[in-house]
Amino acid sequence: MDAYWRASNYLSVGQIYLLDNPLLSEPLKREHIKPRLLGHWGTSPGLNMLYVHLNRVIKRDDLEMMYVIGPGHGGPSLVAHAYLEGTYSEVYPDISQDAEGLRKLFKQFSFPGGIPSHVAPETPGSIHEGGELGYALSHAYGAAFDNPELIVACVVGDGEAETGPLATGWHGNKFLNPARDGCVLPILHLNGYKIANPCFLARIPREELQKFFEGMGYAPLFVEGHDPADVHQQLAAALDTALADIRRIQTDARVNGNLKRPAWPMIVFRTPKGWTCPAEIDGKKCEDYWRSHQVPMGDMDKPEHIRILEGWMKSYRPEELFDGDGRLTAELAALAPTGRRRMSDNPHANGGLLLRDLKMPDFRDYAVAVQSPGAATAESARVMGSYLRDVMKLNLKSGNFRLFSPDENNSNRWQDVLEVTDRCFMADIYPEDDHLSPDGRLMEVLSEHQSQGWLEGYLLTGRHGFFSCYEAFIHIIDSMFNQHAKWLKVCNEIPWRRPIASLNYFLSSHVWRQDHNGFSHQDPGFIDHVVNKKADIIRVYLPPDANTLLSVTDHCLRSRNYINVVVAGKQPSPQWLTMDQAVKHCTEGLGIWEWASNDKGCEPDVVMACCGDVPTLETLAAVQLLREHLPELKVRVINVVNLMKLQPSGEHPHGLPDRDFDALFTKDKPIIFAFHGYPWLIHRLTYRRTNHANLHVRGYKEEGTTTTPFDMVVLNHLDRFHLVEDVIDRLPQLGARAAYFKQAIHERLIDHRHHIEKYGEDMPVISGWKWGAGSAGKAQGTSTKGDNV
């Protein structure tokens, strides 16, 4: 085993430094070394030793195991093991198991046209790149859920352990059911240093460290030392103990029905940073110090550095590790598992291999009956929740669907799912608790990071899910979204990576209905962030009512390798489309609402476009005012569900061709666009369109407070009155005919201000507005006064 460790260390150093002469079959020269040295050595030897010992128990016990490494900058390590196990050559036949293959393996690392420095999607066996630190445990627990035979060995770097998401990630054990789920074996890689500083967990007494992890609900096992022979013995014993404890816990739960939360084992692995590299270089400490974090020697134009590198690599005795052709010796190769038991070839690390379609009810069965536009009222999110309840019910037996939320499931109106499942919870449960159970499939923890990380781990290992969150607070995982989008982008370019289920976001409690919580809860900017990513990855939907939301939800759950963002409200609101109309509208992604328009057979005077449920409501109210006061005006109403339809077809696969866009929006008529989010996003998406100069967008412009629902749109000039004023200002031909109308609009806004400041609620003429009923009508129930979450 020590020889196998030396082989993986040799390959790790070779990837960082060598361009040629992979077996050091001739004296090392400057031309054998890369001109630019990139990569990270410091964590690699520790990762290598852990991998070798995990292989021992996998082979001995025929285990199904994955390796998730938080310090993903140790890319040379996982690539080395994938190569030594043969997996690398299977998926990349050009990297053969001989001296020439070794040369190519070394050259390609962190080299133009080669592979990245981290455990990116190109690395067989990886589901976690580890470039942005903090999510290793979240991904590991997500992978373990509903995988009862899987053990996820999760290495946590001591630097990563200082991040917020990782600090919360330890609590994943409060949601892991030993009867139903697999196991996560956390391994704290305590090598003492980050890039240029010590790690605080390495500088506190062992007793304090032990108490910390015991307080987290773990039974820590310590492996500590500098001498490899001693550490080999300690690590072997610790793994044997950990696996025995895991088997005991799982047997007790699965055979005896004991679901009391156990103290799962974990390992504290304290070894030197940069282990086995030169102790000093140029008179400065290197091994067991931060200088070994990346490339211990950067200036290879110094002959002395070449001699040091050669001596370092020869210290691993490559002649004992590889035969004359450059192949790993048969004796060492026999130490590794074979086939799918190899961690580099575990199918869970290529989740698309295991992905099975969800059993889906017909979403049309959940339709809201709409006799005429605006006649019915419904809570769109609650209707969606009823549909998801039955998706959950149909897939309980297969155990491949979960919902995730940071304590916002009920607030976002998905409580119907609790009719068929509970909230997963392994801590103490009291009699008065609401739907808590170790067997629950609703994952609620007040951490957007854990919700996102668990879902990613769940998806990456071949399952399905949906993430519900307040719109403003989804920003907390902006960078996690980034990393998953990057992962999917690269996976699309790797033939052996199979497609996985899409990552689906449902954003509710949105900006226009956060009047009760105030300014801190008002931010629609996540969609701006999303559209920065690759067009073949991201999708953004803003359904205007429940039936369109049902159609979009069904589509998202059937899609693969996308990130779908769905934004819709949870408050009672008018319903516009029948189910048949909704399906057609969502299929097209946008279109003219003929029933709201009066320009058929002629050119419109103005186009009124809307995207989002509240902007749609305000647009239709504005159109009705225009019909009443300027009946001769020809108005075309366009609603947008699929935001990416606005981009040209050359920019996004869903984008409308210019000819079709011009036919809808005209080439020269004013366009008043009421948008759910920040208005400049619409300008970004449409700046190349013919009629962009006539496009005027209203949306959220960072005005908000605790106020009434209608005042929110007034503050941002998205209300019906400002929209009407925008039309008048852009149609000079109206002249004096519009003067009195415009004055009446200003007076109505003054009335609004006086009314809310006196009574604390919107005017009945606003809250009671109804399409087709004139300026006032039966209440639609858009108030949020009863909603304090």
UniProtKB/Swiss-Prot annotation:
The enzyme's E.C. designation: 4.1.2.-
Pfam families: XFP, XFP_C, XFP_N
UniProt record, GO biological process: carbohydrate metabolic process
Keywords noted in UniProt: Lyase, Thiamine pyrophosphate
EC supergroup of this enzyme: lyase
GO-annotated molecular function: aldehyde-lyase activity
Swiss-Prot/TrEMBL cofactor(s): thiamine diphosphate
Signal peptide: none
Classification via SUPFAM superfamilies: Thiamin diphosphate-binding fold (THDP-binding)
Similarity comment text for this entry: Belongs to the XFP family.
Protein name according to UniProt: Probable phosphoketolase 1
